[in-house]
Amino acid sequence: MSTMNKEKLKGLQSFLKDDIWRVTEDEVSKSRGILYNAIKIATLSVREFTQGRILNKASALTYSTLLSIIPILAILFAIARGFGFSNLLETQFRSGLEGQSAAAETILGLIDSYLVHAKSGIFIGVGLVMLFWTILSLTYNIERTFNYIWQVKKPRTLYRKMTDYFSILLLLPLLIVLSSGLTIFMSTMVKNMEDFVLLAPLMKFLVRLVPFILTWAMFTGLFVFMPNTKVKLKYAIIPGIIAGTAFQAFQYLYIGSQIWVSRYNAIYGSFAAIPMFLLWAQISWGICLYGAELCYVAQNLRNYSFSKETANISRRYHDF
């Protein structure tokens, strides 16, 4: 029995390492072809993710995020105040730092101080320039990482960077408010429909699904928009769903860990949130970049040379 199991295991290893790469879609049924393609994409994406040292790129983006988080939040809150929904944005921000109220208040104080110094006194010009330059640097690093994954050598022009990136910053607070408003609306609907035995559970499920749908859309849009090349939407949807689901699952774990860490606030104070934020940023960027790798492999699957020596697969060609 043990010998048979070893033979089956060797056969499976041989199939995954060699045979599956020689199978074409015409030789198998449609469902089996989809399964084989999924296995190929998963295998190649993990290989490219590890061999390309993408986690090192995630660490670099974590460092850039740490330097840019206050300026970015300052811009978002400034835009929110301009539209008159800063209180709603603050509520969302505090809920994201559940269990770390001291850290949340410290960050909000830094944001207010940053905005005051950026628009007052003799340093108004320098402050605004530094504010926008910090944000532009982070978005440039994000684009450069996505271009690295997609093997794109030419970045966006400076004009396109400014127009594209600041359009995102303008839309982001609006999307946050839309998400909050939609969740509140559906929660109200659930309360009003408690007497409807069949519809109430469905509405509760939809309320819980809203954050996932918005996160899926966010990652899908990021995978399509951020690389400076043509990315087909159909190849970004499933990676967006996978990355978005992983991100939401990690968010639940992160919020739970924040509540646990809050017990140590008497010792560490608001500094207890710093290592947690670094961990959150590192894992979040890792999830995001793996999703981008999935998207790249899915779009370029046919251009890979599926030979016996799969380690020599070329990444130089793109399917547009």
What are the functions of these language-model segments?
Residues 2-320:
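Membrane-embedded alpha-helices and immediately adjacent juxtamembrane helical segments
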